[in-house]
Amino acid sequence: PANHPERYRIIYVPSVRLCAIQRWIHKNILSLLPSSCYSYAFDKNKSIKDCAERHMGCNWLIKVDVQNFFESITEDQVYFEFKKMGYAPLLSYELASLCTKERESPPYSKWTKYHYERVRTWNKIAQYQRTRKRFLPQGAPTSPLLSNLVMIPFDKKMGEIAQREGFVYTRYADDLYLSTANKNFNRKKALLIIKQIYDLLRAFKFKPNFAKTKISS
């Protein structure tokens, strides 16, 4: 229905000061890093056209949408991305905080639940204490490239599935595409592929948007 909540996207606009900081992080840190070879969104050297061209001449196309893509990416995932870049744990924590937004609800346990170095010490500092979970907000300048970084392991696994099944795989933000030129492929086999995609999404703490899954032939 037209008024269904999933038909709307919530865009979080950061304050002027925070936006300036996030733009700096985007320009001086995130934009310098390579993205997944399977990802075609948020990359100045790639486009939706390039993504579509990878599937030209296919006989079957499967499309799966990730539900609440940005909001499904958590502060701890962002923290580990900065840490993998070589930043110290505390600085990674600070950067992750700058790039994420606190959820309005529900409350959750503090950061002591996470196995971060020195996090128990940080929680003794008032401004580092957490009472609610944080997520990657759609609308922040840093969110697109951070989402691509977080998705690299997922893309790698999806690429392995695609290669094994004789498919081409691409991702454009929250849209996953798999195609094959195999004329002997059928809808029953497509449903088995989709199940593998759903299982992998769940393994990475994402949810598929069942209503947007499509099989085209």
Spans of features found by a protein language model:
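A structured, charge-rich N-terminal accessory region that forms the first stable segment of a protein
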Residues: 1-2
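Conserved polymerase palm-domain catalytic core
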Residues: 56-173, 177-216
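Active-site-proximal segment of RNA-dependent polymerases
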Residues: 18-72, 100
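Active-site flanking loop/helix segments enriched in acidic
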Residues: 5-8, 132
